Protein backbone atom coordinates (compact mmCIF):
# COMPACT_ATOMS: atom_id res chain seq x y z
CA UNK A 1 0.00 0.00 0.00
CA UNK A 2 1.27 3.45 -0.89
CA UNK A 3 0.63 6.40 1.41
CA UNK A 4 0.46 9.94 0.09
CA UNK A 5 1.59 12.98 2.03
CA UNK A 6 -1.99 14.29 1.93
CA UNK A 7 -3.33 11.06 3.43
CA UNK A 8 -0.71 11.15 6.18
CA UNK A 9 -1.44 14.83 6.90
CA UNK A 10 -5.17 14.16 7.14
CA UNK A 11 -4.64 11.14 9.40
CA UNK A 12 -2.25 13.01 11.71
CA UNK A 13 -4.44 16.12 11.79
CA UNK A 14 -7.36 13.94 12.85
CA UNK A 15 -5.23 12.02 15.35
CA UNK A 16 -3.58 15.02 17.03
CA UNK A 17 -6.34 17.62 16.64
CA UNK A 18 -6.80 19.41 19.94
CA UNK A 19 -4.43 17.16 21.86
CA UNK A 20 -0.93 18.01 20.67
CA UNK A 21 1.05 21.20 20.31
CA UNK A 22 3.71 22.00 17.78
CA UNK A 23 6.19 22.20 20.66
CA UNK A 24 5.39 18.67 21.87
CA UNK A 25 5.59 17.33 18.31
CA UNK A 26 8.91 19.12 17.81
CA UNK A 27 10.36 17.56 20.95
CA UNK A 28 9.31 14.11 19.71
CA UNK A 29 10.86 14.90 16.31
CA UNK A 30 14.18 15.78 17.95
CA UNK A 31 14.08 12.56 19.99
CA UNK A 32 13.55 10.55 16.82
CA UNK A 33 16.35 12.38 14.99
CA UNK A 34 18.61 11.43 17.90
CA UNK A 35 17.62 7.79 17.43
CA UNK A 36 18.47 8.04 13.72
CA UNK A 37 21.87 9.51 14.65
CA UNK A 38 22.49 6.63 17.06
CA UNK A 39 21.67 4.06 14.38
CA UNK A 40 23.90 5.78 11.84
CA UNK A 41 26.73 5.67 14.38
CA UNK A 42 26.14 1.93 14.84
CA UNK A 43 26.12 1.36 11.08
CA UNK A 44 29.40 3.27 10.77
CA UNK A 45 30.98 1.25 13.59
CA UNK A 46 31.34 4.24 15.91
CA UNK A 47 28.94 2.67 18.40
CA UNK A 48 28.46 -0.94 19.47
CA UNK A 49 25.56 -2.86 17.94
CA UNK A 50 23.66 -5.83 19.35
CA UNK A 51 23.54 -7.51 15.94
CA UNK A 52 19.97 -6.54 15.13
CA UNK A 53 18.88 -5.53 11.62
CA UNK A 54 20.15 -1.95 11.56
CA UNK A 55 18.64 -1.24 8.15
CA UNK A 56 15.18 -2.20 9.38
CA UNK A 57 15.68 -0.17 12.57
CA UNK A 58 16.86 2.83 10.52
CA UNK A 59 13.75 2.61 8.36
CA UNK A 60 11.56 2.48 11.45
CA UNK A 61 13.21 5.54 12.99
CA UNK A 62 13.05 7.46 9.70
CA UNK A 63 9.32 6.67 9.59
CA UNK A 64 9.05 8.23 13.06
CA UNK A 65 10.92 11.34 11.85
CA UNK A 66 8.53 11.66 8.91
CA UNK A 67 5.55 11.09 11.24
CA UNK A 68 6.43 13.94 13.58
CA UNK A 69 7.60 16.33 10.83
CA UNK A 70 4.32 15.84 8.96
CA UNK A 71 2.37 16.06 12.24
CA UNK A 72 3.83 19.52 12.86
CA UNK A 73 2.69 20.56 9.39
CA UNK A 74 -0.73 18.95 9.85
CA UNK A 75 -1.58 20.63 13.15
CA UNK A 76 -0.57 23.95 11.58
CA UNK A 77 -2.65 23.43 8.43
CA UNK A 78 0.39 23.42 6.15
CA UNK A 79 -0.04 21.70 2.77
CA UNK A 80 3.24 19.83 2.47
CA UNK A 81 2.51 18.70 -1.10
CA UNK A 82 2.47 22.32 -2.24
CA UNK A 83 5.44 23.30 -0.07
CA UNK A 84 7.59 20.36 -1.23
CA UNK A 85 6.94 21.11 -4.91
CA UNK A 86 7.65 24.84 -4.49
CA UNK A 87 10.76 24.25 -2.36
CA UNK A 88 12.11 21.72 -4.87
CA UNK A 89 11.62 24.17 -7.75
CA UNK A 90 13.68 26.75 -5.89
CA UNK A 91 16.37 24.22 -4.96
CA UNK A 92 16.48 22.85 -8.52
CA UNK A 93 17.27 26.30 -9.85
CA UNK A 94 19.74 27.11 -7.06
CA UNK A 95 21.64 23.84 -7.43
CA UNK A 96 21.21 23.61 -11.22
CA UNK A 97 19.41 20.26 -11.26
CA UNK A 98 18.52 18.96 -14.70
CA UNK A 99 14.93 18.31 -13.64
CA UNK A 100 12.69 19.35 -10.77
CA UNK A 101 10.29 17.16 -8.81
CA UNK A 102 7.13 18.43 -10.51
CA UNK A 103 8.54 17.71 -13.97
CA UNK A 104 9.79 14.31 -12.82
CA UNK A 105 6.33 13.37 -11.52
CA UNK A 106 4.68 14.52 -14.75
CA UNK A 107 7.16 12.51 -16.84
CA UNK A 108 6.58 9.42 -14.68
CA UNK A 109 2.83 9.74 -15.20
CA UNK A 110 3.32 9.75 -18.98
CA UNK A 111 5.64 6.73 -18.98
Regions found by a protein language model. Give the residues of each.
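Flexible "arm" and connector segments at domain edges
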Residues: 1-62, 66-111
Amino acid sequence: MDVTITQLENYLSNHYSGRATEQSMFMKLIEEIGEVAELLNKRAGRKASDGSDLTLELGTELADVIHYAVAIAAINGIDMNDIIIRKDKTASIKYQHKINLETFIKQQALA
